[in-house]
Amino acid sequence: MKKRGRKSKKPEEKRAEYDPSSILPLELKIEILMKSPPKSIAKLGFVSNHWSSIIRGQVFTDLYMRRSLAHPRLLFSVYRPNMQMQFFHSCSQEDPSSDHRSVSYTLNSDLRYSFSPPIGGLIFGQNNTKAMIGNPSTGQFVPLPRIKTQRKHIFSIFGYDPVNDLYKVLCMTVRTLRGPHYFRWEDPMWEEPMTEEHQVFTLGPKQKWRMLECKYLHRHHSGSQGICRDGVMYYLASFNDKRSLMSFDLSSEEFNVTKLPEDYILQQFGNMVDHSGKIAIVSQAYSGPMDLWVLEDVSKEEWSKVAAIVPSITDIVGNDQRVIFRGILSTGEIILSLLPTPKPPFFFLCYDPKEKTARKVVIQGIGEDYAAINVFFDHVESHMVLSKLT
C-alpha cells in the first residue's frame, strides 16, 4: 500500500510557526499595536496574514479611531519649490510644541497638488486632471485615475459616506461663455448660461469616475473650499442668479440647494466651517468684527448670526500685518494667520472668544525654505493601508 505523503505547508504557515508573537494573547497584541506609530502599524500589516487580520479587524480599528478622535492633531501641507517637494507635518493640537511628525514625497517639476481638508485621516490632492489619495500618517500616497474632462477649471471635494462606509470624491468642471477664469461676485459672467460636468469617484480597486446628473444649473464659488459633514458635502455656489449653499448627499448622490441669508454679505473668499456640529459660513475679515452664519435647520433654510469680536493683536503681529480667518477648532477657538505667510518660524494666532484672549502658536520643524503652507485642524491619525486604486 502506497503511503500518502504529507501535505507541504504554505510559506505563510511556516512563518507563523517561527513567529514568537503567535503565542501572545490577542489583548496584548492589540496593546502593542496601540503603542506603535502609524507607519509601523502599516508595515506590520504586510508581515503576515495574522497581523494583517488584527490590524484590519473591526475591534482594533474602532479602538484606534476612538483614541485618534480624542487627540486631534494639526496637519500642515508645506510646499518647497527649491526641492520640488511637498510634505506633511503634524503635531498635537492640544500642545503644538509636542509630538511632531513629518512625511514627504517628491513631485514632478511641474506638479503641485492642492489638498482638501482631511477626512477620517485621509487626504485628497489634485492638480488639474491628476488626483491622489494619501494617508499622511503612514506616508502612503496613491494616484487616482485621471479626471475625465477637457476643461481646465476643476473643483473637487473629498468626503466620507458613513451609511455605506465609503470615501468619495466629487468633481465639478465649469465652462462659461467667456471662458474659465477666477470669479468675482460683481462680474456679469456670473449671470450668463453655463454648463457643468459632475463626476464622482468611490475609493476602491478597479473604480472609475462616474458622471452624475444635477438638476440645479449652478456654478460653484471658486474662492471657497467645500466641507463634508455627516455624509453630506456643502459648497458655495450661484443658482438662479442668487448666492446659494449647494449640498451633495454621498449616500443617495443627490444635489440640493439652500438659500443664503438675505443680509449676508459674501466676500470673494468665503470660509465654510464646522461650528459646534453645524455648518457655518464666515465673512472674511482681516481684523475687528467677524460674523458667522450658522445653518440651524436645512429643511427650513433657517440661519442664525453669531458675532465674534476679535481684539486688537497689534502687540503680537505688528502694525503692518493683516490677519485672515483660517478655521474654528472643536473647542470653539478661532484660528487666524498672517497675510502674507510669515517668515520662519511659522506661527498662527489662536483666539478664545470665551476668555477673550489671543495667543501666538509657533510651529517648529517645518524648516525655513517653504513657499506656501496650508493648515488643517482636528486631523485624526489613521493606520489605514490604501489599496491600489488605479
From Swiss-Prot:
GO BP term, example: protein ubiquitination
SUPFAM superfamilies documented for this protein: F-box domain
Kelch repeat boundaries on the chain: 115-161, 272-323
A cellular component annotation (GO) from this entry: nucleus
Occurrences of domain F-box (ranges): 18-67
Assembly and binders: Part of a SCF (ASK-cullin-F-box) protein ligase complex. Interacts with SKP1A/ASK1, SKP1B/ASK2, ASK11 and ASK13.
Protein purpose: Component of SCF(ASK-cullin-F-box) E3 ubiquitin ligase complexes, which may mediate the ubiquitination and subsequent proteasomal degradation of target proteins.
Protein name in the entry: F-box/kelch-repeat protein At3g04660
Organism from which the protein derives: Arabidopsis thaliana
